């Protein structure tokens, strides 16, 4: 695992955006060989999307030959609902870049047969061979995507019941009314994420410190699904200083020294 400790959330966003752009450009995608990018929603990646838009507007990257797969979607919210992840992605990112709409893949939370929808999504990912880079965030309880605590670490795309902690955390998007938050979501599995060639996780804020500790210093544990990244061959975790508060001082120092050596 590569841990990149930075000073603040703004630096995390800029670093992640530059990393993604460099990966896309190095890949030299074409219509026949697209770069496949996994994407999250939520507050943590929002600034990264803004930075990616800036880099696109500056002519440093094109998304014309990029195919995206989003992590998750609420069950029961139509795409036009302002709190659906369809709406979030188009409003905050896709509408501002040159990605063809047919290259965008987001789970259908309105599907009549959600199991079939999840199987279709997995098959679509397989049709491209693999996801080259999957960006994600982490919940305060260590969940990635909607793989809540005690999720199988080999799980695939499926429907999940959201925990009370997640409902409370997401209620800020629903008039602070936990009863308005959908109780179910479709989500890629931990196994789906682990199949990606590379995983890039953004961790910011004091409230994510325990999750980061579980990810970096804890044992692999299904109660902290983020800990599965320890088994990934190419996992990159980018964090700000507040998120490192529960890590040992020597752990942070170790990874900072590694980054200094990489920069030389």
Curated annotation (Swiss-Prot):
Belongs to the glucosamine/galactosamine-6-phosphate isomerase family. NagB subfamily. This is Glucosamine-6-phosphate deaminase. The active site is at 72 (proton acceptor), 141 (for ring-opening step), 143 (proton acceptor), 148 (for ring-opening step). It is an enzyme of class 3 (hydrolase). Signal peptide: none annotated. PANTHER family: GLUCOSAMINE-6-PHOSPHATE ISOMERASE. Pathway: Amino-sugar metabolism; N-acetylneuraminate degradation; D-fructose 6-phosphate from N-acetylneuraminate: step 5/5. The record marks 151, 158, 160-161, 254 as: Part of the allosteric site. It comes from the Bacteria. The keyword Hydrolase applies. Keywords: Allosteric enzyme, Carbohydrate metabolism, Hydrolase. Catalyzes the reversible isomerization-deamination of glucosamine 6-phosphate (GlcN6P) to form fructose 6-phosphate (Fru6P) and ammonium ion. GO terms for molecular function: glucosamine-6-phosphate deaminase activity; identical protein binding. The keyword Phosphoprotein does not apply. One of its GO terms (cellular component) is cytoplasm. CDD domains: GlcN6P_deaminase. Its EC number is 3.5.99.6. Pfam families: Glucosamine_iso. It catalyses: alpha-D-glucosamine 6-phosphate + H2O = beta-D-fructose 6-phosphate + NH4(+).
């Amino acid at each position: 695992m590569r841990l990149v400790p930075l000073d603040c959330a703004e630096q995390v966003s800029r670093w992640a955006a530059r990393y993604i752009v460099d990966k896309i450009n190095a890949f030299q995608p074409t219509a026949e060989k697209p770069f496949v990018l996994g994407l999250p929603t939520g507050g943590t990646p929002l600034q990264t999307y803004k930075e990616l838009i800036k880099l696109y507007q500056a002519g440093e990257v094109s998304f014309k030959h990029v195919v995206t797969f989003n992590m998750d979607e609420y069950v029961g919210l139509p795409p036009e609902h302002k709190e659906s992840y369809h709406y979030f992605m188009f409003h905050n990112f896709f509408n501002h870049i040159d990605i063809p709409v047919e290259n965008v893949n987001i789970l259908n939370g309105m599907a009549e047969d959600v199991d079939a929808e999840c199987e279709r999504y997995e098959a679509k990912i397989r049709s491209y061979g693999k996801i080259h880079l999957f960006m994600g965030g982490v919940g305060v309880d260590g969940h990635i995507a909607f793989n809540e605590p005690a999720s199988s670490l080999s799980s695939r795309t499926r429907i999940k019941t959201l925990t009370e902690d997640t409902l409370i955390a997401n209620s800020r998007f629903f008039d602070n009314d936990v009863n308005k938050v959908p109780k179910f979501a479709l989500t890629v599995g931990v196994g789906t994420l682990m199949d990606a060639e590379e995983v890039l996780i953004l961790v910011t804020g004091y409230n994510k410190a325990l999750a980061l500790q579980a990810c970096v210093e804890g044992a692999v544990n299904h109660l902290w699904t983020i800990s599965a990244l320890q088994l990934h061959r190419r996992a990159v975790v980018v964090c700000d200083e507040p998120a490192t508060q529960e890590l040992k001082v020597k752990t942070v120092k170790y990874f900072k020294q590694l980054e200094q050596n990489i920069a030389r």
